[in-house]
Regions:
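Short, surface-exposed acidic
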Residues: 200-211, 255-265, 301-307
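Small-residue-centered hinge/linker elements
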Residues: 1-140, 157-158, 163-248, 308-363
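Structural detector of well-ordered beta-strand residues that form the stable sheet scaffold
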Residues: 145, 167-168, 282
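Amphipathic alpha-helical segments at domain termini/boundaries
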Residues: 211-238, 242-247, 252-294
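Extended hydrophobic/aromatic segments used for targeting, binding, or gating
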Residues: 286-323
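Glycine-rich beta-to-alpha transition loops that act as phosphate-gripper elements at the mouths
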Residues: 145-153, 265-268
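Glycine-/small-residue-rich active-site loops that bind phosphorylated ligands and cofactors
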Residues: 120-121, 152, 283
Length: 363
């Protein structure tokens, strides 16, 4: 019986060693291919290009880089996040900026097409995109064109006004130059939370009390069991007013608009294409293909001698590639995770967002 057990153990170890050796051999082979060994084998699928082809003349050396700004704009992904962009409604401004910085080093990129589909988001995330656009233009002298497909509101406007020109597709909405500050809740004489007996909440005869221990004047601002003071509300309003002043100045300077018109006539409304053009928010109405053609014209590229490309999927390393077949693919963040991440930003941050952000956090 002992001999049988030892024989089985030996066979198991032999299989494990064979598997490890196979991984090592595959790793050496992949490394060799990448450095020229085994050059007769195509490396196309083993070394993904920096960009992937979208449309145009695939043989052209003139790249027009398409960058998607789709969803709520945040700053940077959480630590350990393997995704450049969430597939379910978030975009990270500093990731967009990084792409623009790298594009500025690539002489094959002759221009940038920003594909805008966003209600806005955080100020710093939106500003990161704007700063990336300005850096790219200053470093290269190449054009950047923003293309609005449906909506670019609030933080989207803050970001895209750095482009040379802005075009919106038919039926789009552009605008919402405004800032949303703190949203404070106050429970006035509460006797239940979360719907009471019908909603599975808590009901008491004497109401619900909550005590927050804090130090520093106004540190417990946001406690729903006390009203904010007039002084606290004024401070919050002053902060929002300051950010709004900066926003108006930013748009006015970069789009050559009158700040008085923005404040008194436009407000924080969104506009159809005709009105947006009249105010100077966009240069006109163009569809996707015609916007690309306009970008090629600004880049002084001969007719049709270009290809539209976008950034390739991020490579997570050789070991991941080798073991990927044995591992389940990482699922994209769940909607609940996305909502939680965004809702955490709402506590004290001023937002450049179109609509009521609390609706994203209401379920």
């Amino acid at each position: 019986m002992l001999k049988g057990f030892l024989r089985l153990l030996g066979q198991t170890l032999s299989i494990l060693m064979s598997f490890v050796l196979l991984i090592i051999v595959l790793g050496i082979l992949a490394f060799g291919i990448g450095t020229g060994i085994g050059s007769s084998i195509s490396t196309e699928t083993l070394e993904p290009d920096l960009y992937t082809f979208v449309f145009g003349d695939e043989s052209s050396s003139n790249n027009l880089l398409k960058i998607n700004v789709e969803g709520v704009i945040l700053g940077s992904p959480p630590q350990g996040d393997l995704y450049w962009f969430s597939e379910e409604g978030l975009v990270y401004g500093y990731d967009i900026q990084d792409i623009l910085i790298e594009a500025a080093k690539d002489s094959s990129v002759k221009g940038i097409l920003l594909n805008m589909q966003t209600p806005g988001g955080t100020i710093f995330g939106s500003r990161a995109i704007f700063d990336g656009i300005k850096l790219y233009r200053e470093k290269t002298g190449n054009p950047v064109v923003a293309y609005v497909q449906g909506m670019s509101a609030s933080g989207g406007v803050l970001a895209m006004v750095g482009a040379n020109e802005i075009y919106a597709d038919h039926g789009s909405l552009v605008g919402s130059i405004g800032v949303i500050g703190d949203t404070l809740t106050y429970f006035n004489k509460p006797t239940a939370i979360d719907g009471g007996i019908l909603g599975g909440g808590i009901v008491t005869k004497e109401g619900i009390e909550q005590t927050i221990v804090s130090a520093g004047k106004g540190k417990d601002l946001g406690n729903p069991f006390r009203r904010p003071t007039k002084e606290e509300l004024k401070l919050l309003q002053d902060d929002v007013n300051h950010e709004y002043d900066l926003f108006v100045k930013h748009v006015a300077e970069n789009r050559n608009m009158d700040s008085k018109v923005i404040r008194e006539q436009m407000g924080a409304h969104v506009f159809d294409n005709e009105s947006a053009k009249k105010f100077g928010l966009i240069n006109g109405t163009l569809n996707y293909r015609d916007t690309v053609k306009r970008l090629a014209e600004l880049a002084q590229i001969e007719t049709d001698d270009y290809q539209v490309v976008q950034t390739a999927t991020k490579n997570h390393g050789l070991l991941s590639a080798l073991l990927g077949v044995f591992q389940p693919k990482s699922a994209p963040p769940k909607v609940s995770q996305i909502k939680s991440q965004f809702c955490n930003k709402l506590s004290r941050l001023p937002l450049v967002y179109y609509g009521n952000p609390l609706r994203l956090c209401s379920h």
